C-alpha cells in the first residue's frame, strides 16, 4: 500500500490504510487545525530532522488508562518523602525544549524539531497542549507534555534530569485525569519505561473507538493550573 501524500486540504486517509509499521501519510504541515484533526483520528506526527513530516497510526496502540497506573514499592517510598514539587502549565516552553534536548527514557536521540516545538507552543497558547513540570529547589528536573481533546490526553514526550522525575510527572497527571474521568493517555509506541507504569497495547480499532466516544465531552481548554474544571481537583502538589 503506497504512503498517502498530504496536500493543503486538511484530510487524512483512514487509519486502516497505515503500513505495517504504522506509517500512514507524508507531508502537509503542523498547523493547529491539522494537528487537532490528526489527534481526533488517532494519528500523530513523528519524524527526524531533514525528513518530511510523517504521520503515524500504529497497530496496536500503546496506552495507559489512568486507573491502571502501577506504582512500585520503591516509587511509593520516594513519593512519600515528598522530594518533588509538581505543577501544571507553568512553563510549557521549558518542558518541550527539555524534551527536545534530553529525550525520554529508551529513546535514542530526539525527534522534536524547532518546527515541532513552535507548533505545540501554539497549541498550548490555544489551550489544547499542556505540560506537567517537576521541580526540586526551584529547578526544573522533569516533566512531560501532550495534547488534550475530549476525554483523551495524547502524550508526546517526557524528560528527566533526575531519577524518577518523569515518573512523578506521569503519576501526577494520571491522578488528575482519573479524577476528571478521562478515558486514556495515549503513549503512542511501546517503551519499557511506560510498560512498568502500567501502559499496555490495545487494538487500533479499539483505540479509535475510544477516542470517538471521548470526543463527545467538551475539551478542557485553557491553562490547567487556573482552569475552573481542574484547579480545584489537583492532587497533592508535593511528592
From Swiss-Prot:
Compartmental location: Cytoplasm
Catalytic activity: N-terminal L-lysyl-[protein] + L-leucyl-tRNA(Leu) = N-terminal L-leucyl-L-lysyl-[protein] + tRNA(Leu) + H(+); N-terminal L-arginyl-[protein] + L-leucyl-tRNA(Leu) = N-terminal L-leucyl-L-arginyl-[protein] + tRNA(Leu) + H(+); L-phenylalanyl-tRNA(Phe) + an N-terminal L-alpha-aminoacyl-[protein] = an N-terminal L-phenylalanyl-L-alpha-aminoacyl-[protein] + tRNA(Phe)
Enzyme kind, highest EC tier: transferase
Molecular function (Gene Ontology), one example: leucyl-tRNA--protein transferase activity
InterPro entries in the record: Acyl_CoA_acyltransferase (IPR016181), Leu/Phe-tRNA_Trfase (IPR004616), Leu/Phe-tRNA_Trfase_C (IPR042203), Leu/Phe-tRNA_Trfase_N (IPR042221)
BP GO terms, sorted: protein catabolic process
EC code: 2.3.2.6
Keywords, comma-separated and alphabetical: Acyltransferase, Cytoplasm, Transferase
Gene Ontology CC: cytoplasm
Family affiliation: Belongs to the L/F-transferase family.
Function: Functions in the N-end rule pathway of protein degradation where it conjugates Leu, Phe and, less efficiently, Met from aminoacyl-tRNAs to the N-termini of proteins containing an N-terminal arginine or lysine.
PANTHER family in the record: LEUCYL/PHENYLALANYL-TRNA--PROTEIN TRANSFERASE (PTHR30098), LEUCYL_PHENYLALANYL-TRNA--PROTEIN TRANSFERASE (PTHR30098:SF2)
Name recorded for this polypeptide: Leucyl/phenylalanyl-tRNA--protein transferase
Organism this protein belongs to: Syntrophus aciditrophicus (strain SB)
